[in-house]
Amino acid sequence: MKQGIHPNYNKVVFMDSTTEYKFLTGSTRSSNETITWEDGNEYPLIRVDVSSDSHPFYTGRQKFNAADGRVDRFNKKYGRK
């Protein structure tokens, strides 16, 4: 393998923004935000909109709990239904 062309693979914590569910895994993603995990170590924190804890396929719920989109925010702001 060539040296210096592969991304760094480290442990990171992913957090679901809608349910606040967190899990520790390995990834090449990095972040300036960190969190202290249950083992006492500090890891980079990656926020995600959807994870297995909130996706309808994994939860069995038909309603999708996602953050409001642009159209929804516009309609709320200007009172449209």
UniProtKB/Swiss-Prot annotation:
One of its GO terms (biological process) is translation. This is Large ribosomal subunit protein bL31B. Belongs to the bacterial ribosomal protein bL31 family. Type B subfamily. Signal peptide: none annotated. GO terms for molecular function: structural constituent of ribosome. It comes from the Bacteria. Keywords: Ribonucleoprotein, Ribosomal protein. Pfam families: Ribosomal_L31 (PF01197). One of its GO terms (cellular component) is ribonucleoprotein complex. It comes from Exiguobacterium sibiricum (strain DSM 17290 / CCUG 55495 / CIP 109462 / JCM 13490 / 255-15). Part of the 50S ribosomal subunit.
